[in-house]
């Protein structure tokens, strides 16, 4: 006797299959399969050959196979110890095409459809398509496309396949024509609208599209308005209602926002209650920056709560909770707060699992971690670990995820996921530097050699004025304590006569080798040492300024009108640096500072020294804008038998990295040579300061590659000497001084000071950093060489 169970009818009517006598399954057959393998079906079945079949298995089989999404219909039949499954497969998707989308990109729409299981080669389900189209329509409606029309078309193909074509007619966006506030007495509508990103129509809205309604932006705007009030003392401000009206053809919208301002409150007493365990309550109370009598600010409370949670987290209480109890006093217009702290369990890190480091060895990452295994969970150490791994430069993304350990409520595993970036390069590139022209370079480098963290580089470059070659190797962990050791071999030929710069009438040839060491002294500080042996050749030419000629005559030799210097220099370097920025790429907070000194040691043919100190500070003004303040000072001189700094080791100013708007290397003392050509030969002292407002390019898809800035620069290069047309040490009275006949000029900080202002663009291109700036000199003198537009393309070595 045979019993047929028709799945869809029974399940829709709520009828259970008829009771059968139990039997042992001897065979299972599947009919109706076209693409699905029988083995796949067997894997999903709740029974197998040899099992005892009873009257509950029919429904279970049907549910299991329907749940796969592979079938439109499933029937189960039994006869003589056999199971016969008859199925109707759903068609598979041959192609999925989208046309007409403008606001949303096709790739983004397809990715969204994939989340519903709608993709090429997947099984097609009409209900799923309807659900996905409805969700896509909601997305458009939320972006102000009220006339959106989405038409899906399903075309049946041979071999049980379908093509899906989705046609989108976005229609015109609804424009916001009016934004009105009701209930506001303290601040005007205009003032409140300035807090919002959505606007009424204006001159620039055709470009910014800020008058196109967007649900997400509107919700953010309401939060901004609330923040504005509550950060100015209005503790009990709230938005009562928002009313959005649309005209009949769905092209215009008006927004009415009803608010309750309430009274303006000042800070009262803020106290901490609860068990803070080993974290002293007095220590947490020091984090309470609110001052009684000052206007209440919600952002201040948010910052304080974050600091308290970080402090609790650094003691191992990763899941501490803080409940805030406000106690407003309507009579005194003050508000007290009680912060109830529930520390929860102290959490320990069981294991740290690292994934994504396909090339980089585990030890290279682990030696940067400050959060240890089997140690208390510490939020500050975890954040520092993330920063240190990011500063390696080997990874584009670093993320930590704490996963509770099953059965152990006080332990977590840390999953560290990394996204590796390319650290090796074979470069053949060309660039353009404004003052020296075409720069061609070739090099091979690897910053993460064989995944060990060591780096090696072989580089060469050629420009109109310079020929460079170098070979370097660095082991950042020469010792387990993080002492780095590096070696360098290099050669350089420099002839500025071939460039447009005013540093002319001499050339240098250098070859040397050195060893360097960097020692970490704290988490953020390093001390650097180095020794270099260098052979230097300097040649001056006929009619060179007397300053050059006198130096070569004193320390080198002359041949007619030309002169040359040859000799070995043994240089020692020492420096200290501190890096407390939050990013190696685009810092937004923190600072960099350093002191560096170089001395040509006794035994060198020339004996001189130089020292510099620099500082750069970053201050976040908002999520978008960062203020950068920087400065540098330097001094150089001779000692022993060398009474002055060699002219070819002078400081120079002007151009990118100094005072923009003035030609590179032209600031400081100047003289004429005997050809009557103006020469800049620099000074032994320098000072530069800069203020720069940094922000990403509006509308850029990747804010991490392009950055704009507005800047102001000031700087000076001087030597303290007095020059005139008869007795200048630089001209020897042979030609007229550039400052005018009979005039004298003392090279002081004030006299040589120049400043400028302008804008700049920095692009981290595949060829290297590209910099463009336009500056307007704010202090000009007749002898200055102005260059408002300056740029540097490609990389130089």
From Swiss-Prot:
InterPro entries from the UniProt entry: Bac_surfAg_D15 (IPR000184), BamA/TamA_POTRA (IPR010827), D15-like (IPR039910), OM_assembly_BamA (IPR023707), POTRA (IPR034746)
Residue ranges annotated for the POTRA domain, each copy included: 23-90, 91-171, 174-262, 265-344, 347-421
What keywords are assigned to this protein? Cell outer membrane, Membrane, Repeat, Signal, Transmembrane, Transmembrane beta strand
| Chief localization | membrane
Claim: Oxidoreductase is one of the keywords in the record: no
Location in or out of the cell? Cell outer membrane
Listed under GO cellular component are: cell outer membrane
Signal sequence residues: 1-21
Q: How does it assemble?
A: Part of the Bam complex.
Anything further noted? Present in outer membrane vesicle formulations which are used as vaccines in human.
Instruction: Name the family the entry cites.
Output: Belongs to the BamA family.
NCBIfam families under this entry? OM_YaeT
**What is the protein name for this chain?**
Outer membrane protein assembly factor BamA
Q: Which organism is it from?
A: Neisseria meningitidis serogroup B (strain ATCC BAA-335 / MC58)
Q: Which gene encodes it?
A: bamA
